[in-house]
Regions:
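RNA/tRNA-interacting regions in translation and RNA-turnover enzymes
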Residues: 1-169
């Protein structure tokens, strides 16, 4: 799928999950065992008591899976490339997730990502699936681009009619 996912130990998460902007001076210990001091406006994922992830960059040590993990929460999300790039640069964090989000991930692939990951995990490890929780607060809307058939034909070196172009697009 070429899209980042993150898996949390669900039993280490307390209460509801919130995605918010960090406050200057907040601390976060990543999966790399490094402590990071955050600036204002870095996107973080939190439970009711703590930051559990730098969104789209690095998961937190406090919610990581280990040999005792029994229940998991899979995150399949879309984060804005500019936000990921800015936070990653400021904190000097390199990760596969950062690399992919910075270059753009299809926002429409979140559902396919979580479905595939869920199937693989249950096939390999067993267990039961629960509901998918979806945050619809910032649903991406389709963009419409006006383009003439003359322009398309000029670029492609063809003589396609309007009807055929509309069918293929």
């Amino acid at each position: 799928l070429c899209r980042p996912l993150h898996v949390f130990d669900a039993d280490k998460i307390q209460g509801n999950i919130v995605i918010r902007h960090s406050k200057k001076g907040e601390k976060f210990i990543g999966l790399d065992d490094q402590e990071y001091t955050l600036d204002d406006n870095m996107v973080v994922i939190c439970d009711e008591n703590k930051i559990i992830s730098l969104a789209g960059i690095l998961g937190g040590k406090n919610s990581c899976c280990d040999r005792e993990t029994k229940n998991i929460l899979i995150e399949s999300a879309y984060f804005l490339p500019d936000s990921i790039s800015s936070t990653g640069r400021k904190l000097n964090i390199q990760s596969d997730a950062r690399y992919r989000f910075e270059r753009g991930v299809d926002p429409e692939s979140t559902k396919n990502g979580i479905n595939l990951a869920s199937r693989l995990i249950t096939k390999l490890c067993g267990g039961d699936l629960c509901e998918i929780i979806k945050d619809n607060s910032s649903i991406k809307r389709d963009k419409f681009i006006e383009i003439s058939s003359n322009f398309i034909n000029q670029i492609l070196g063809t003589n396609l009619n309007d009807k055929l172009i509309q069918e293929k697009l």
